[in-house]
């Protein structure tokens, strides 16, 4: 039997882990940077009218960007793989056709939501909405907002992962009441 099972979603993982905690009562804690309950709406708001361009053009531009930036290339391939498609544009189309809105009303476990002030407007909106709803269900549900001064205000705190991880593990220590002398 699992006594202390936590799940941590980063970036798009904030959507995939939301789906997991919505349905799996074995999960005792959810951490997300940032939580996403409606990925299609996020894509609509963040990518906007650029999604109306023809698939071949979007894929050509993304291929060029990937050739110039290896990290971007890996991220685009990762998203295509996560959605079971061959390219990023197909992944986006798949999201619009099949992605479900997470029923966050069903989430019962304590949550730690992490958000940088540098996040996109829709990511900040969804984080605040889900936090406001879930904090009343569980006193241990927290929202950590990183301002620019913290050096952790970028998407998923990539500019200060150490600080973000300190917040995560301090919260888990408190939540699970771990005895530090056992380690």
Annotated model-derived regions:
Residues 117-122:
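Acidic catalytic loop of the alpha/beta-hydrolase fold
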Residues 2-11:
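Alpha/beta-hydrolase fold nucleophile elbow
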Residues 22-91, 114:
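Hydrolase active-site cap/lid region
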Residues 109, 123-133:
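Short alpha-helix in the alpha/beta-hydrolase fold that links the catalytic acid
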Residues 154-183:
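Catalytic active-site module of serine/aspartate enzymes centered on a nucleophile-bearing elbow/loop
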Residues 107-108, 113-115:
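Short beta-strand/loop motif that positions the catalytic acidic residue
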Residues 131-153:
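Catalytic histidine neighborhood in serine/cysteine hydrolases
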Residues 85-103:
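Active-site nucleophile elbow and catalytic-triad environment of alpha/beta-hydrolase enzymes
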């Amino acid at each position: 039997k699992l006594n202390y099972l936590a799940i941590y979603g980063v970036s798009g993982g904030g959507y995939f882990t939301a789906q997991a905690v919505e349905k799996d009562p074995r999960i005792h804690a959810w951490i997300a940077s940032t939580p996403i309950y409606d990925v299609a709406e996020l894509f609509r708001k963040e990518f906007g009218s650029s999604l109306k361009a023809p698939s071949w053009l979007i894929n050509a531009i993304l291929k060029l960007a990937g050739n110039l930036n290896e990290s971007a290339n890996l991220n685009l391939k990762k998203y295509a793989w996560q959605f079971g498609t061959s390219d990023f544009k197909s992944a986006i189309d798949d999201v619009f056709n099949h992605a479900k809105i997470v029923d966050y009303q069903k989430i019962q476990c304590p949550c730690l939501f992490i958000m940088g002030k540098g996040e996109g407007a829709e990511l900040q909106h969804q984080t605040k909405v889900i936090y406001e709803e879930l904090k009343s269900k569980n006193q241990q549900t927290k929202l950590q907002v990183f301002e620019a001064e913290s050096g952790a205000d970028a998407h998923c705190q990539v500019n200060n992962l150490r600080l973000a991880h300190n917040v995560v593990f301090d919260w888990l220590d408190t939540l699970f009441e771990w005895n530090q002398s056992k380690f």
